[in-house]
């Protein structure tokens, strides 16, 4: 419990928790005059892994467990980096470099999971600690005083994909929507809402860059968001019907669809099964 309170919450069915435990035992028992950096590293590196993949989510339809982000571990991970940097002046710069990269990920993933206020908190911390450091790889102008939180997150999505061509952007939007549908089917509402909101933001950014010129819009513009959402939903449900029918049924229930909506062997869904609004909407999972 002591280790979990200080470095967690940890998922003790995953190896990172045990690595952190034994390294913390080593810190307690070693002579303070010894080089403790290997032990400190053996704590903050697994803590970073625990943040990225330290939560188990049960998929009752496939009877498997999946690893997800452990966002609740972010506060203690942040604290550990800062304390270790203070305790070890020799390796301070090394630890703070790792801390800087951790903060970028924390901002991004908190926002992606619809924990906007927490994301803003760490964005502010980054701005205070690293005001002259770029948030985006390869863009030295993306310092926190020159890029807004929303803008950083959308740019980070595109950075992760590595391309912002129309086909690639469409793939990003559809991928985010499918992630939203999957999370919603597993009752992971926070994730579902976050993915849907991100899909809207990416679509809006690309659409606003092309809709001023009709010829450009016709040539490389994206379809309306609701059309993309409906197509992504159709593809997701039809694939799930083949591979995980119980998951597909769960999503239909969460979205208020009929039991045969979007089934491959059935005719097109009735009007009541279609999204009502033509405008992007992602505030609630029911709109995903």
Question: Across the structure, where does each feature detected by a protein language model lie?
Answer:
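Alpha-helical solenoid scaffolds that mediate protein-protein interactions
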Residues: 77-88, 125-134, 199, 206
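Alpha-helical adaptor scaffolds
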Residues: 61-74, 127, 154-166
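Extended ligand-binding clefts on enzyme/binding-domain cores
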Residues: 1-101, 109-114
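Long C-terminal extensions of eukaryotic subunits of large macromolecular complexes
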Residues: 66, 157-287
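Glycine-centered coil turns and helix-coil junctions that link the paired helices
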Residues: 106, 112-113, 129-132
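Structural register within alpha-helical repeat arrays
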Residues: 99, 105-106, 172, 179
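Boundary/linker segments of alpha-helical solenoid repeat arrays
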Residues: 129-152, 206-216
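Solenoid-repeat scaffolds in large eukaryotic assemblies
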Residues: 118-120
């Amino acid at each position: 419990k002591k280790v979990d309170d200080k470095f967690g919450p940890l998922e003790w069915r995953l190896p990172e928790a045990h690595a952190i435990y034994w390294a913390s035992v080593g810190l307690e028992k070693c002579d303070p005059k010894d080089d403790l950096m290997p032990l400190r590293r053996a704590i903050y590196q697994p803590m970073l892994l625990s943040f990225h993949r330290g939560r188990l989510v049960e998929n009752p339809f496939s009877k498997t467990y999946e690893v997800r982000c452990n966002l609740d571990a972010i506060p203690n991970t942040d604290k550990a980096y800062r304390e270790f940097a203070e305790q070890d002046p020799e390796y301070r710069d090394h630890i703070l470099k790792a801390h800087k990269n951790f903060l970028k990920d924390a901002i991004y993933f908190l926002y992606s999971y619809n924990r906007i206020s927490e994301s803003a908190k760490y964005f502010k911390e980054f701005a205070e600690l690293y005001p002259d450091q770029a948030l985006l790889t390869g863009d030295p102008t993306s310092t926190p005083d020159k890029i807004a939180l929303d803008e950083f997150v959308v740019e980070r999505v595109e950075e992760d994909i590595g391309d912002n061509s129309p086909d690639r952007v469409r793939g990003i939007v559809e991928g985010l929507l499918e992630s939203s549908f999957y999370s919603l089917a597993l009752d992971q509402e926070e994730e579902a809402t976050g993915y849907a909101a991100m899909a809207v933001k990416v679509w809006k950014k690309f659409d606003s860059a092309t809709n001023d010129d009709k010829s450009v819009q016709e040539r490389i513009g994206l379809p309306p968001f609701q059309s993309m959402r409906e197509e992504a939903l159709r593809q997701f449900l039809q694939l799930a019907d083949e591979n995980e029918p119980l998951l597909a049924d769960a999503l239909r229930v969460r979205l208020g669809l009929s039991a045969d909506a979007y089934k491959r062997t059935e005719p097109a869904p009735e009007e009541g099964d279609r999204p009502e609004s033509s405008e992007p909407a992602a505030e609630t999972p029911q709109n995903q």
